[in-house]
Design a protein with these regions (language model features):
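Basic nucleic-acid-binding alpha-helical/helix-turn surface characteristic of O6-alkylguanine DNA
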Residues: 1-117, 165-175
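A short acidic, helix-capping loop that chelates divalent metal ions and anchors anionic groups
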Residues: 45, 143-144
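Residue-level recognition of specific faces of alpha-helices
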Residues: 96-99, 133, 159
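The short coil/loop that forms the "turn" connecting the two helices of the helix-turn-helix
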Residues: 116-117, 128, 142
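Major-groove DNA-recognition helix of helix-turn-helix-type DNA-binding domains
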Residues: 125-126, 130-134
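Short Lys/Arg-enriched helix C-cap and helix-to-coil transition segments
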Residues: 134-141
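…primarily DNA-binding HTH/wHTH and HhH modules…
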Residues: 145-175
Length: 175
């Protein structure tokens, strides 16, 4: 959940991308959320602040531009100011997700082992990632290589991994 309710600088806008219209939630000078239509952890309307015009918000425009470039294969990362609120384990998982290189995947079990946490707890933290794509939770797959869980839907996860697959050619398939 986003802990910026009733903050006057909390705002949201919608950005059109190759993955569909994304709701971008910003607070002050930081990105706090990216939500797909039908996203299973989408915050309540009151939690995303006032609506802002994308063209009038430099940070929102920068987020959109970096996401569009990433989805076009022109970037391998997004370099954006983030403010991610959550429990300590979630913070640790989200930090580790940012270290998974473009074109590579890991498993929930491997993350759990690295972090000394239960796989189910790690899975919950991955699923609670408020900034999908920027914090690349789509790079986490099942132990058997299957695509499991993605708040934006498995088809979007498949699309993101397929986008990154050419970078993995020398290392083998992503999934």
């Amino acid at each position: 959940m986003i802990d910026t309710v009733d903050t006057p600088t909390t705002r949201h806008t919608v950005a059109s991308t190759a993955l569909g219209d994304l709701t971008l939630v910003l607070d002050g000078d930081a990105l706090t959320g990216i939500y797909f239509p039908g996203h299973w952890t989408r915050p309540e309307r009151a939690e995303v602040g006032r609506q802002t015009d994308l063209a009038d918000d430099p940070l929102a425009t920068e987020v959109r531009d970096q996401l569009v470039a990433y989805l076009a294969g022109e970037r391998t990362t997004c370099d954006l100011p983030l403010r991610l609120d959550g429990p300590a384990l979630h913070q640790a998982v989200w930090t580790r997700l940012q270290q998974i290189p473009y074109g590579e995947t890991t498993t929930y079990g491997a993350l759990a082992e690295e972090l000394g946490a239960a796989p189910q707890a790690v899975g919950q933290a991955v699923g609670a990632n408020p900034v999908s794509v920027v914090v690349p939770c789509h790079r986490v797959i099942g132990a058997d290589g299957s695509l499991t869980g993605y708040a934006g839907g498995l088809e979007r996860k498949r699309t993101l991994l397929a986008l990154e697959e050419p970078a993995a050619t020398d290392r083998g398939a992503l999934f």
